Amino acid sequence: MKILNGAELASFVKVRQLKQVRNLRQSKKIIPKLSVVYVDSGNKVIDTYINLKKAYANDILVEFSVYKENADTIIERLNTLSRDDNIHGIIVQLPLPGDLDTDQILSHINPNKDVDGLSGGNFTPATPMAINWLLSGYGIDLSGKNVAIVGRGKLVGAPLIRLWKESGYNVDVFEKGDGYDLHIEIPKYDVIVTATG
């Protein structure tokens, strides 16, 4: 079994993005701005994800802002950011608290500013695209291969399943509590993607 390392790809992408942002700043006088919106649910992992995004944005010279909202204010914040011509990208940090309708909230992001591609617009979400690029970089074609995806979350699993099934690939999905013993099932597959967090 070969484990693919995304670190080289991530480094390449980061260098490329830094060049693109420098070009925007120098030749077009555009300062890219990214806003992250979240609802505090007490989940400390959210803080970690936001801090990682902030560090990445700083590394590639993108201005970064964070908005802590609640159930009553998040939609208005998203509408405001979506209308603001000075904001170029918006991310809703997931997961949202269970009592909120995630799809309904995401639908308030202007699709042209939806960095994660989750608002129902025409963009393929970023992580599934990165997985495709990683496979391509290693020369792996999924045609005729048996593919397993473990997890069907909104950010990775579900959009990857949809993308690959639409491409005609043979994809089986495994999720916690579905009754399968992954130690028995997974070795049967040519390509395995874990999308479990």
What are the residue ranges of the model-derived segments?
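Short beta-strand segments
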Residues: Y38, I91-P95, V150
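Residue-level recognition of beta-strand->loop/alpha-helix junctions
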Residues: Y38, V66-N70, E175
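Anion-binding alpha/beta catalytic cores of soluble intermediary-metabolism enzymes, centered on
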Residues: I3, S82, G89-L142, L182-H183, ...
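Glycine-rich phosphate/diphosphate-binding loops that line cofactor/substrate pockets in enzymes
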Residues: V21-P32, T80-D85, G139-L142
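Active-site cofactor/substrate anionic-group-binding motifs, chiefly glycine-
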Residues: V45-D84
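Short beta-strand segments enriched in small/hydrophobic residues
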Residues: I31-S41
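Glycine-rich phosphate/diphosphate-binding loop of Rossmann-like nucleotide-binding domains
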Residues: V39-A55, P125-G197
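Positively charged, low-complexity intrinsically disordered leader regions
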Residues: M1-K28
